[in-house]
């Protein structure tokens, strides 16, 4: 599979990533390299290999749920480019 420049622009638009026109060929090359690697992985014979669901096979401790304010909401919200009250303001992405 190979992505053309129009497809790269469409992916960027859907991901809400602003691309300059000179970035499109470089990004197309990088994405095509990634897709090529994924195609190689699809060709690997995994007959008889048990599926892996996680890296470490250990039991995790459960903890009680508790409602908190995050301990430092003002510091967290200080990173927001825009906020409405105590919430991050984000652009609408679903039409």
UniProtKB/Swiss-Prot annotation:
The keyword ATP-binding applies. SUPFAM superfamilies: Glu-tRNAGln amidotransferase C subunit. InterPro entries: Asp/Glu-ADT_sf_sub_c, GatC. One of its GO terms (molecular function) is ATP binding. Pfam families: GatC. It catalyses: L-glutamyl-tRNA(Gln) + L-glutamine + ATP + H2O = L-glutaminyl-tRNA(Gln) + L-glutamate + ADP + phosphate + H(+); L-aspartyl-tRNA(Asn) + L-glutamine + ATP + H2O = L-asparaginyl-tRNA(Asn) + L-glutamate + ADP + phosphate + 2 H(+). Its EC number is 6.3.5.-. GO terms for biological process: glutaminyl-tRNAGln biosynthesis via transamidation; regulation of translational fidelity; translation. Keywords: ATP-binding, Ligase, Nucleotide-binding, Protein biosynthesis. Disulfide bonds: none annotated. The keyword Metal-binding does not apply. Heterotrimer of A, B and C subunits. Allows the formation of correctly charged Asn-tRNA(Asn) or Gln-tRNA(Gln) through the transamidation of misacylated Asp-tRNA(Asn) or Glu-tRNA(Gln) in organisms which lack either or both of asparaginyl-tRNA or glutaminyl-tRNA synthetases. The reaction takes place in the presence of glutamine and ATP through an activated phospho-Asp-tRNA(Asn) or phospho-Glu-tRNA(Gln). Belongs to the GatC family. HAMAP family: GatC. PANTHER family: GLUTAMYL-TRNA(GLN) AMIDOTRANSFERASE SUBUNIT C, MITOCHONDRIAL. This is Aspartyl/glutamyl-tRNA(Asn/Gln) amidotransferase subunit C. It comes from Acidiphilium cryptum (strain JF-5).
